[in-house]
């Protein structure tokens, strides 16, 4: 059919524009997407969790290893995670979205994997645009933009950022070994290329 032929033409003429992150580039390439999904399903133990995070990363331009390190640190990939803070606010779900920061969400939304991933990545992207640095962005995600900008970052946030950085580094290393090494370098040429 015409639709099938168009799909094949699109697939064979896939244009790669580097995002600057191998994980995101591999996810966006139809030839390597399955390997990325396989890798992160193995990390999370859940196809639903892995795919929700990857989709949100793609939409917001977030490096997957950063997003998965954040989700692991926040909830250990548990969509039912819940934490009551000292100030009485409640963090819920995969990305531990705070009820005061996201008042538009209903109770059940916080525990919805797709909603949590979408809002978590939108908020992380907001922090990245302000911070211009992934580790500062993660600090802002945890402690709040104002506290970090005003040099009032709590010690607990510094430990949190360190844990995310270490986990992200492990993910990046494993991704190189388990996924990137399986593919020919010619799949990813930094400028627009037709495959």
Where is each model-derived feature located?
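Short amphipathic alpha-helical segments that mediate assembly, nucleic-acid/protein binding
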Residues: 4-5
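Catalytic glycan-binding domains that act on GlcNAc-containing polysaccharides
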Residues: 8, 12-195
